[in-house]
Amino acid sequence: MRNIFMSLVVIFGSLFSGCASGLIGTLPEVTNYSNASEIIIIRPFNFEAHGISAYVVFDNSDIFAIRIVQYAKFPAPPGNHTIGVRYPGLPTNNIAMLLAPKERYYYCIGANLANFSLFQITEKEALLFIKDLYYMSLDNNVK
């Protein structure tokens, strides 16, 4: 009986751990917030992979996990960087980008049964998504 109970705990724990969201690493170091770029990550609802958190990766470091119907934003220093998204335990699909000072960049997460994808969208497209999503705060100090 004890083995069955422990097996159920492990199974349900594994299922719910995929639903976690929030910081899993550190945000990019920004020394001058008045000059920082802002990155907004949007994860709208989709049926595929809806029970799995997407790991957002900036400059090859995991920074946060995000669930469906959430969006988050974070500051980043201007310059050349990479951003990506991945399933926990799988390689990252990275995008190279050049961030300009004081600019906003919007990225949307797509998913299928094999992996996540990340693509840049316009502000107009982002605002249409955001109105139906929950904001996930990453840090009280984010401007």
Which residue stretches match the model-derived regions?
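Short loop/turn and low-complexity linker motifs enriched in small/turn-promoting residues
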Residues: C19-K143
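Sec-dependent bacterial lipoprotein signal peptides
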Residues: M1-A20
